[in-house]
Amino acid sequence: MEISTCVKYVGVNDHQVDLFEGQYKVPNGMSYNSYVILDEKIAVMDTVDGFFTEEWLNNVEQVLSGKTPDYLVIQHMEPDHSASIPAFLKKYPKTTVVSTAKGFQFMEQFFPEFFAVQGLPAEQHIVAANDGVLELGQHSLHFVYAPMVHWPEVMMTY
């Protein structure tokens, strides 16, 4: 779905779930939001629940049209947002991951089989600073830490 000429929605819809966070009724299901920003550098914003990895990767691939993403920005490590990180990095192994220090700590804990086998070279990850900026070209991503708004590693990007 096109948000603008440079921003594309690549998320997926889960019509099977009836409770969000195990307690809030969602009679129409819910969305796992993910976006691609197409610029001189390409950023993919977040991943999706593991049950939807294949559909999401297909959405990403379609939007990229043969290009390789430069960045994968991970704003939150709860599994419904992060479960597709290993599959994404297997498909796009040269992509640089951007997250908080705590986010990277969680990645190592959640995906030890992936990070222990393949690792993530220092040049392939960026610890986003609070109030930090990542330049994509005409677009700039600004990072704001929001620990404990939901989980301890959360950051927002605008």
Q: What residue ranges belong to the model's regions?
A:
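Metallo-beta-lactamase
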Residues: 2-5, 99-154
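Active-site environment of divalent metal-dependent phosphoester hydrolases
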Residues: 17, 77-82, 104-107, 150-151
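Short coil/turn connectors at secondary-structure junctions
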Residues: 40-41, 68-69, 93-94, 121-123, ...
